[in-house]
Amino acid sequence: MTDKEIHLKVVEAQQDDAYKGIARIDSELMRELGVRRGDAIIIKGNRPTIAIVDRAYPADVGEGIIRIDGILRRNAKAGIGDSVSVSKADVKEAKKITIAPAQKGIMVQGDERSLRNGLLGRTVMKGDIVVLGGVQRRKDLMSEEMGEMDDIFGNINDILGGMGFGGLGGGVTQIKFVVANVNPNQPVRITENTQVTLNPKAVEISEEKVPEITYEDIGGLEEE
């Protein structure tokens, strides 16, 4: 990470970015941090977490805000209206990660390939909560600045053609998972080379309860 750090006010994410691990900030602030669209940033409230950065919506420019969804807010231990610090992340390719259901009473079975396909391009830290999906959005975001991302996403058309979740049970894309372990033990990005292991039983999370319904969920219902 660089030494440059900025402080921004947390506001809710829009539906297009919900549960995809994406944060939006002013492009001028991105330049200050030395990051481009698709790079990783550390967001820290009472806990540090990591997200992929995109530029702010035009109406948000100059407002000093960061748009993150309920999962990222939980991961950063920050609420809407809180101030968080934001800095450039030093992110490595994940060699191996272990995930487990984050909600008690849930058991999940699935194969490594299907799980990995649902997390491609995602940046995570140990203890983060994640949701499967959002792969195409992440690839589009990262490819615009960085070119083809085959080393991360592989043949994404094949993945998306089959939805990538063939080895998982129905409704799994709505399940929240906790990242129980990462190798190396630092901020990482999940790629097609990452080994993803599933602990089928829910793990105890010592921090606050995982949100079952977030502001973005409610916003989505209102839009329907």
Which functions belong to the PLM regions below?
Residues 1-10:
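Short, low-complexity N-terminal leaders and the immediately following helix N-cap/first helix
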Residues 6, 21-24:
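Eukaryotic beta-rich interaction modules
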Residues 27-31, 36-223:
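AAA+ P-loop ATPase mechanoenzymes
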